């Protein structure tokens, strides 16, 4: 079989359908493919996202994929100090990713894109030294898909970006290992997400409880992937220490989480890479849905312009714009992550005691200069040359 489109998008997670929808809306022929039998499965996500993304990226606020509205967060230090951020208005939601991802593909289809599940991209097709399409397998049948532009939105292990010669390598230290139970659990405020920090609790990461119902939540952990012990070991240890029986497990999810190593070259000739495939993830908390939406929006803008003007060199503006905007922000967040890796449990106790909720949000988003300057004046920071040195790395 042979097919021809203006654009083929490989991967129907978050970034892929955003690109497919936006380009199809502009009147171009688009094919969105995903290797899974059912788009959205298996879940590899804690499912929390800011309320702001729905308006910003023109996504309907549909109760079919929203499990619970969230009003803030609660952070716990190694010694049990707490920092609560509670808002009067909804600040975020816990999604049902299996439904959300499928609905994003649905919106792309409604905009005019063709969407095919169980279609796996295997390689690129080259003609006279140029990439002109991809080789794929659709329901076990070989197919050649020719396209003017190819979008690699196929996740952390992106086949298409690698086959196209885009350097997506990142060392193991730039990944976290994630392990998560969806389980019955009680005793936590279901209107907040809950995060526990500590070098013995979750090395370089945190434990999370993200409520999906009054007594049901995603309970998971992310730790450095080069740790000799597994994420499951630390999660089960935390559950046992907190007397939470792991006997009502509805689902188990595992995954590799990029927390750095952003891909430098986001467009090469007629190939564009977005989302997890480009490591476009917040290095502090490992969340990448909003980042994928932003990257997909920027990429689709330049894809449309390149097609309209029949000038593929315009795709390079995607790389330029992303690095000048979200890339610049995420590089600042990465600096924070590098510093937090050096914090002791005593440091974590101190900062959770003296930071406000607004301060914590600014640090996680990369807008931290004023917060750091204020911390540098705190007596317990001034008394420690090591803490002073660490914080000054962020300025």
Swiss-Prot record:
Gene3D superfamilies the UniProt entry points to: D-Amino Acid Oxidase, subunit A, domain 2, FAD/NAD(P)-binding domain
Cofactor binding, note field: Binds 1 FAD per subunit.
Recorded superkingdom: Archaea
SUPFAM superfamilies attached to this UniProt entry: FAD/NAD(P)-binding domain
Annotated function: Is involved in the reduction of 2,3-digeranylgeranylglycerophospholipids (unsaturated archaeols) into 2,3-diphytanylglycerophospholipids (saturated archaeols) in the biosynthesis of archaeal membrane lipids. Catalyzes the formation of archaetidic acid (2,3-di-O-phytanyl-sn-glyceryl phosphate) from 2,3-di-O-geranylgeranylglyceryl phosphate (DGGGP) via the hydrogenation of each double bond of the isoprenoid chains.
NCBIfam families in alphabetical order: GG-red-SF
Identification of the protein by name: Digeranylgeranylglycerophospholipid reductase
């Amino acid at each position: 079989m042979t097919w021809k489109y203006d654009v083929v998008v490989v991967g129907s997670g978050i970034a892929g359908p955003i690109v497919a929808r936006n380009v199809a809306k502009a009147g171009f022929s688009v094919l969105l493919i995903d290797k899974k039998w059912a788009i959205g499965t298996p879940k590899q996500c804690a499912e929390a996202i800011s309320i702001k993304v729905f308006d910003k990226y023109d996504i309907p606020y549909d109760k079919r994929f929203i499990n619970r509205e969230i009003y803030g967060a609660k952070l716990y230090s190694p010694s049990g100090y707490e920092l609560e951020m509670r808002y009067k208005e909804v600040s975020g939601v816990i999604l049902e990713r299996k439904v959300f991802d499928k609905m994003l593909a649905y919106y792309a289809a409604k905009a005019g894109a063709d969407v095919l599940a169980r279609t796996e991209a295997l390689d690129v097709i080259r003609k006279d030294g140029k990439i002109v399409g991809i080789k794929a397998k659709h329901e076990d049948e070989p197919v050649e898909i020719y396209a003017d532009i190819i979008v690699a939105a196929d996740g952390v292990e992106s086949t298409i970006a690698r086959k196209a010669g885009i350097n997506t390598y990142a060392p193991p230290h730039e990944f976290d290992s994630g392990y998560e139970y969806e389980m019955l659990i009680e005793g936590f405020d279901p209107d907040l997400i809950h995060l526990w920090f500590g070098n013995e609790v979750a090395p370089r990461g945190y434990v999370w409880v993200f409520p999906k119902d009054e007594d049901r939540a995603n309970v998971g952990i992310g730790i450095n992937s080069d740790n000799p012990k597994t994420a499951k070991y630390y999660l089960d240890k935390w559950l046992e220490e907190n007397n939470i029986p792991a006997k009502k497990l509805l689902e188990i999810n595992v995954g590799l989480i990029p927390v750095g190593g952003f891909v430098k070259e986001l467009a090469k000739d007629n190939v564009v890479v977005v989302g997890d495939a480009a490591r476009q993830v917040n290095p502090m908390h490992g969340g990448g849905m909003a980042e994928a939406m932003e990257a997909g929006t920027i990429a689709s803008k330049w894809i449309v312009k390149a097609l309209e003007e029949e000038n593929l060199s315009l795709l390079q503006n995607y790389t330029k714009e992303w690095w000048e905007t979200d890339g610049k922000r995420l590089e600042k967040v990465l600096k924070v992550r590098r510093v937090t890796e050096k914090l002791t449990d005593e440091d974590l106790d101190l900062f959770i005691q003296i930071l406000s909720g607004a301060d914590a949000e600014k640090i996680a988003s990369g807008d931290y200069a004023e917060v750091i300057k204020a911390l540098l004046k705190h007596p317990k920071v001034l008394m420690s040359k090591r803490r002073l040195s660490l914080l000054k790395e962020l300025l």
